[in-house]
Amino acid sequence: MNLMNIEQNAENLRLLGLIVAQRGETIYQHNWDSPCRRLLFSASKSFTGAAVGFAVQEGLLRLDDRLIELFPDEAPENPSENLCRATIRDALTMCIGQSRGYLMGAQRVGMAEEDWAKAVLALPFDEAPGTHFVY
């Protein structure tokens, strides 16, 4: 891979940034645009699903692990029963227990909380996890 070629053609490729890692070490990193939140639309689901699949295969987590146990520092002080029952499987199937989508369009851009996990876990979980699909 010729990284100089990539740098020279980055504008034509419309790259925002590039990180190359080898054996767990970052060997190259360059940003062509300033860091900011980007809407990735449905691409996020593909990356997340693949990452979770690898983590399950490596024994790092299970689909039935509870979100509250994976994100204890991001959880609200008094989590609801529904939030306490929500699992990775529920998150991957978009059935974590919320009755409506809270992070669509302008809501996402205007969100004050920088920590996405903390922001999502602070939202109401008013449905039983696994029972109500919300995009």
Where are these regions (language model features)?
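A short, mixed-charge helix-start or loop-turn motif at secondary-structure junctions
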Residues: 5, 32-34, 77, 124-129
